[in-house]
């Protein structure tokens, strides 16, 4: 049996992203999303989650992305830049973390605060993942999985896309190498999660083409979907031009949203006997 979790990241980051995710859920086949508890529009996202109780909701642990922490800046200063925000990306964070400049006590306190903020919102949390996949980095993954067990969140994203998978997406060698490194870290994280009795999808898609998916590329993934539970990570939103002026990632938010509204892809789900599910299917 083929099952697919279509998980929209960055819920709570911006109203146009929130609106795109909900549109993709109500009118398309997005089945799950990941709430950023420290993001500027997280309260709007919580309200939308409460209005759409069948939408799977994960916690998108955030240690990067130039957003503010949940805890006061003075309590987690080793995680932040001079403006009191998280570092811009995983590369900057990894350099600081592996140089020994991040205090483990501050890291754990902030991750706990993010999980607890989501739990206090009274929404059913289906899983844990993270912004730019920092939760699978060696040295952080063990802490995150410990917290999963402690807070009884028994499912986790494992972003282990197959090393050779392209799905028709053409890119440079640098992106391929980056994906390979992440998949290797995710493979180690999967082994650790399995040893702790945590659950995760068997397959993962959407890494190499992250932020650049469209109807054709999603269709290619559906055509090649293996048996079992697969996660497809996506980043839908409304008005790519407006979002592109705010965020530097050059994502194609509108195209990603349209991929799940596309009538051809909806028919493909039926033709391939693919069941849309959320993380509770793991």
PLM feature segments, named:
Residues 2-5, 15-127, 139-282:
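Terminal accessory/targeting
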Residues 130-132:
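Active-site histidine-anchored catalytic micro-motif
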Residues 135-137:
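Active-site pocket-lining segments that scaffold enzyme catalytic pockets across diverse folds
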Residues 8-11:
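DG-centered beta-turn motif at the end of beta-strands
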């Amino acid at each position: 049996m083929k099952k697919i979790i279509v998980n929209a990241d960055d819920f709570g980051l911006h109203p146009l992203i929130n609106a795109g995710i909900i549109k993709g859920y109500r009118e398309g086949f997005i089945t799950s999303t990941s709430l950023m508890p420290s993001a500027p529009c997280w309260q709007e996202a919580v309200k939308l989650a409460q209005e759409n109780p069948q939408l799977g909701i994960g916690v998108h642990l955030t240690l990067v992305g130039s957003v503010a922490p949940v805890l006061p800046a003075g309590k987690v200063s080793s995680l932040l830049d001079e403006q009191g925000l998280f570092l811009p990306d995983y590369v900057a964070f990894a350099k600081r973390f592996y140089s020994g400049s991040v205090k483990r006590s501050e890291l754990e306190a902030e991750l706990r605060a993010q999980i607890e903020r989501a739990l206090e919102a009274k929404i059913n949390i289906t899983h844990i993942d993270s912004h730019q996949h920092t939760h699978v980095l060696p040295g952080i993954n063990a802490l995150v999985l410990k917290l999963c067990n402690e807070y009884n969140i028994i499912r986790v994203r494992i972003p282990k896309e197959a090393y050779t998978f392209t799905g028709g997406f053409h890119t440079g060698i640098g992106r391929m190498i980056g994906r390979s490194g992440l998949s290797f870290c995710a493979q180690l994280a999967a082994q650790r999660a399995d040893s702790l009795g945590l659950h995760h999808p068997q397959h993962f898609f959407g890494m190499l083409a992250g932020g650049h998916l469209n109807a054709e590329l999603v269709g290619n993934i559906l055509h090649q979907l293996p048996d079992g539970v697969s996660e497809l990570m996506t980043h839908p939103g409304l008005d790519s031009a407006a979002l592109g002026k705010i965020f530097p990632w050059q994502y194609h938010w509108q195209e990603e949203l349209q991929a799940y509204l596309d009538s051809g892809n909806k028919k493909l789900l039926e033709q391939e006997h693919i069941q849309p599910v959320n993380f509770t299917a793991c």
